[in-house]
A protein has these predicted regions:
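Short, well-ordered beta-to-alpha junction loops that form the rim of enzyme active sites
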Residues: 40-42, 137-141
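Soluble or luminal CAZymes and related metallo-dependent hydrolases
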Residues: 14-22, 64, 112-120
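Short glycine-dipeptide loop
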Residues: 33, 128-134
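Short glycine-rich, flexible loops that bind phosphorylated cofactors or substrates
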Residues: 92-94, 143
Length: 178
């Protein structure tokens, strides 16, 4: 499968999906009447199931992202989710800021972003149905990965100018179990 690649420019925003090309990227995959999950939703209500650690957001749940995904598994959503979103904090500093906002003490293991991402991806994966899509956002293209049976179908770079890192938006499709 050929990977669709594009690049846009837009000013950065703390609310990732408010950046027009990024919001458009999400809406492209967010079809009506599908089951969608966002473990790091903040105030976005575009998705069927939303979560954010911060209780001052509009998310439906306020759990650790891994725990949220496991709650949905227990509710019978294994293999039923059409669209998963991975828009977690991009850096250890951002993780620390999120924890501090809610008065949670931050330990070194909490800011090991690769461990957080792996735990959440491992918990999100069983929810995604075959041919379901996961959209990942950040500063790399690690995504769900081939070991979990995913194939990259689209990458969009969004340049923010100056000394800002680009936001990398990636869509992956879940193939049959390897």
């Amino acid at each position: 499968m050929d990977i669709i690649f594009s690049r846009d420019w837009a000013m950065p925003n703390l609310d990732t999906f408010s950046v027009k090309p990024i919001g458009d990227f999400v809406k492209k995959y967010l079809k009506e009447n599908i089951i969608s999950v966002d473990p790091f939703a903040r105030d976005k209500d575009w998705f069927t199931y939303t979560n954010d650690l911060n209780p001052n957001t509009k998310a439906q749940y306020h759990l650790d992202a891994e725990e949220f995904c496991k709650v949905l598994q227990d509710k019978g959503l294994k293999g039923k989710v059409d669209l998963g979103i991975m828009d977690s904090p991009y850096s250890p500093r951002q993780i620390s800021e999120c924890y501090k906002q809610i008065g949670k003490k931050v330990a070194m293991e909490d800011t090991q972003s690769s461990l957080l991402y792996k735990r959440v991806r491992d918990a999100l994966d069983p929810l995604i149905k075959e041919n379901g899509i996961v959209l990942s956002f950040g500063w790399n293209t690690v995504g769900m990965g081939i070991k979990r049976g995913y194939e990259i179908i689209e990458i969009k770079l969004v340049c923010h100018g100056g000394a800002h890192n680009d936001t990398i938006c990636m869509a992956e499709i879940k193939n049959s179990v390897i």
